[in-house]
Regions:
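ABC ATPase NBD coupling module
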Residues: 38-54, 192
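The feature captures the beta-strand-to-loop junction immediately N-terminal to the Walker
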Residues: 6-8
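Non-catalytic connector elements of ABC transporters
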Residues: 208, 219-319
Length: 319
């Protein structure tokens, strides 16, 4: 399994990894790995006896050793040569085995470091922001290679990241931390994205359009339309979150079924168009709204559009 710790900078994600690895001592509580207590206020099993692999942000490859020598360094009499050869084959660097780390690209160094961390067959592998130093195009390639390698290795993994989409791509279970280091919600990527428990979790997976108001008659009136609310929120002050992809637009000179919006800007972002809209609230004051539409949707500035809401991309919480 691949479990992710997702949270903002300063929330204690890396510190937790160090505690699990035995690089720091716990001040309270316990850490249990495979049924064995490895850390408590009265016990501290040394790092080298925990059978844990650790991939650091800077990779920590030995600069004086070749790729092959780096990979073979963690092995001992208990490790079969076939396991080493299998891992070497998986990293797809047949022509680089005799090179030194400084002769490799960032992505190649990352693959070698990952392979070295799993070649000794650890019970648990810890990854600390493993893709943060890579540029966007290389990050996607290396992330895909990493997932493939981890699945092939059949090792349990805990990965730390502040990138929600990276967490969704590579893990099958996510724990969301708040700034204090508390776990706010845990679950599969699908659960957390589609069933967030509060505004914090909702916002962690990207920008949302937010509107506040009071529920009346099982509905709340927003600048982008009337939204049905759960029955248990009647009379409550609530905040409505609508993801940009939940704001659907039609090119209409006048609204037919929805609410009128005016296009302030339309920007092609590659796979989608980012539309910046202005709408009027109940007090005739301008409110700004963001929409993500298919790339071919590119309305002119100042043009009128019709707004409709996708309820599946709408989330309502007590304020």
């Amino acid at each position: 399994s691949i479990s992710c710790i997702l949270g903002p900078s300063g929330s204690g994600k890396t510190t937790l990894l160090k505690l699990i690895a035995g690089l720091e001592k716990v001040q309270s509580g316990k850490i249990i790995i495979n049924g064995e207590e490895v850390s408590s206020t009265s016990k501290h099993l040394p790092t080298e006896k925990r059978k844990i692999g650790f991939l650091f942000q800077d990779y920590a490859l030995f600069p004086h050793l070749t790729v092959k020598e780096n990979l073979k360094f963690p092995t001992n009499a208990k490790n079969s040569t076939s396991n080493v050869d299998e891992i070497i084959e998986l990293i797809k660097l047949p022509n680089s085995l005799d090179k030194y780390p400084h002769e490799l690209s960032g992505g190649e160094q990352q693959r070698v470091a990952l392979a070295r961390s799993i070649i000794s067959q650890p019970n648990l592998l810890l990854l600390d922001e493993p893709f943060s130093s890579l540029d966007l195009s290389l990050r996607e390639e290396v992330r895909d290679d990493t997932l493939h390698l981890l699945q092939k290795s059949n090792v349990s993994v805990i990965i730390v990241t502040h990138d929600p989409f990276e967490a969704m791509f590579i893990s099958n279970h996510i724990n969301i931390f708040d700034k204090s280091g508390s776990i706010i919600q845990s679950g599969t990527p699908n659960d957390l994205y589609n069933n967030p428990k509060n505004s914090y979790v909702t916002g962690f997976f990207g920008e949302t359009n937010q509107f506040k108001g009071v529920v009346k008659g099982s509905h709340i009136i927003t600048p982008v339309g009337k939204i049905k609310t759960p029955e248990n929120l009647e009379g409550e002050n609530v905040v409505v979150h609508i993801r940009p992809q939940g704001i659907k637009l039609n090119k209409q000179p006048t609204p037919v079924n929805g609410i009128k919006g005016t296009v302030m800007a339309s920007k092609l972002m590659g796979s989608f168009s980012f539309i910046h809209l202005s709408v009027l609230d109940n007090n005739n004051e301008i409110v700004h709204v963001h929409s993500h539409m298919p790339a071919e949707f590119n309305p002119k500035q100042s043009s009128a559009v019709e707004i409709e809401i996708d309820n599946d991309q709408t989330y309502i919480f007590k304020n």
